[in-house]
Amino acid sequence: MLLKGAPAADHILATIKENIRACSKAPGLAVVLIGNNPASEIYVNMKIKRATDLGMVSKSYRKPSDATLSDILALIHQLNNDENIHGILVQLPLPKHLDAQAILSTITPDKDVDGLHPVNVGKLLLGETDGFIPCTPAGIVELCKYYEIPLHGKHVVILGRSNIVGKPLAALLMQRHADTNASVTLLHSQSEHLTEITRTADILISAIGVPLFVNKEMIAEKTVIMDVGTSRIPAANPKGYILVGDVDFNNVVPVCRAITPVPGGVGPMTVAMLMRNTWESFLRHTS
C-alpha cells in the first residue's frame, strides 16, 4: 500500500479552511528565511502559498546570509509583539555562524508553531497537551491515523536522533494516548546491530538524510515504512537530479506492507501540521 500524504493533508486543511472562513479575523503566520538556500526558498514559498490558500495572512521576512544574530533576534522580538502574528517559523537550516537554538528559544512559546522552543519540547516530554508538537512527528502520527495503521503496542524503530524529527517523534510515540502508546527504539550512526534491530520493527521510520540507505535486507515482511528523508541524486533529466528518500523504494516495495513515497509522503503532512498549529495558536490568542 502506498501511503500518500496529500489525501490525509487535504482532509485536515479543508477543515482549517472552513473554520477560517467563519472567522472575522485571519490567522497570521510569519516565516523567516535567512540566506539564499535554494531548497529553503522552495519550502518557504510552499508554506506561504499554502497558508494564503487557507485564508491566513502569511508574511515572509528575508534576511541576507551574513545577517547577525542580533539582527535576527530583533526581528523575532518584533514578531513576538505583533498581535496580528499568531505563528512564527524560522526556516532551517541556518547559516553556520548563527546559533539556531538561541534563535528558536527567542520565539515566544505560544507562537512557536514549529514546536521547537524548549518549553514546547519539555511539554511534549512530560505528556502535556497544551504545547505545540513538532510538525513532522505530528504529521506521521496523523498519517497513521488516516490509513488506520495502529501504533498502540507496536514496535516502532526510528532511524535518526535529530531535534527536529527523531527525538520528538520518539517522545510523541511513547505517550500514553490511544493514538500512540508504542514501544520505541531510536537508532543512530553509532548504533550496533542495526539490521538485526530494524528487522524487528512493525513500523520503521527513517529520518537520517542518507539517500537509499534502507534496503529490503533491513526489514521484515509486512513492515510499514515511513520515509522522512529527502535527498537529491544525479539523474539524466532536464533538472539533472531526482528526489529520493532514505529508503530504496523499488528495492523494498515487494517486501513491505506499506510505504510513504518521496516526494509526496510525509512532506505534505508536515506542512498540514504547521497550518494546524498556526490555527490553534490563533484560537488561543483570540479566545
Swiss-Prot record:
Gene Ontology MF term list: methenyltetrahydrofolate cyclohydrolase activity; methylenetetrahydrofolate dehydrogenase (NADP+) activity
Origin: domain of life: Bacteria
EC number: 1.5.1.5, 3.5.4.9
Residues at which NADP(+) binds: G160, R161, S162, S189, T230
A biological process from GO: tetrahydrofolate interconversion
CDD domains named in the record: NAD_bind_m-THF_DH_Cyclohyd
Pathway noted in the entry: One-carbon metabolism; tetrahydrofolate interconversion
Keywords assigned: Amino-acid biosynthesis, Histidine biosynthesis, Hydrolase, Methionine biosynthesis, Multifunctional enzyme, NADP, One-carbon metabolism, Oxidoreductase, Purine biosynthesis
GO CC annotation terms, alphabetical: cytosol
Keyword Amino-acid biosynthesis found: yes
UniProt cross-references to InterPro entries, sorted A to Z: Aminoacid_DH-like_N_sf (IPR046346), NAD(P)-bd_dom_sf (IPR036291), THF_DH/CycHdrlase (IPR000672), THF_DH/CycHdrlase_cat_dom (IPR020630), THF_DH/CycHdrlase_CS (IPR020867), THF_DH/CycHdrlase_NAD-bd_dom (IPR020631)
Reaction equations catalysed: (6R)-5,10-methylene-5,6,7,8-tetrahydrofolate + NADP(+) = (6R)-5,10-methenyltetrahydrofolate + NADPH; (6R)-5,10-methenyltetrahydrofolate + H2O = (6R)-10-formyltetrahydrofolate + H(+)
Entry-linked PANTHER family: C-1-TETRAHYDROFOLATE SYNTHASE, CYTOPLASMIC, C-1-TETRAHYDROFOLATE SYNTHASE, CYTOPLASMIC-RELATED
Similarity annotation: Belongs to the tetrahydrofolate dehydrogenase/cyclohydrolase family.
Role: Catalyzes the oxidation of 5,10-methylenetetrahydrofolate to 5,10-methenyltetrahydrofolate and then the hydrolysis of 5,10-methenyltetrahydrofolate to 10-formyltetrahydrofolate.
Subunit structure: Homodimer.
Protein's recorded name: Bifunctional protein FolD
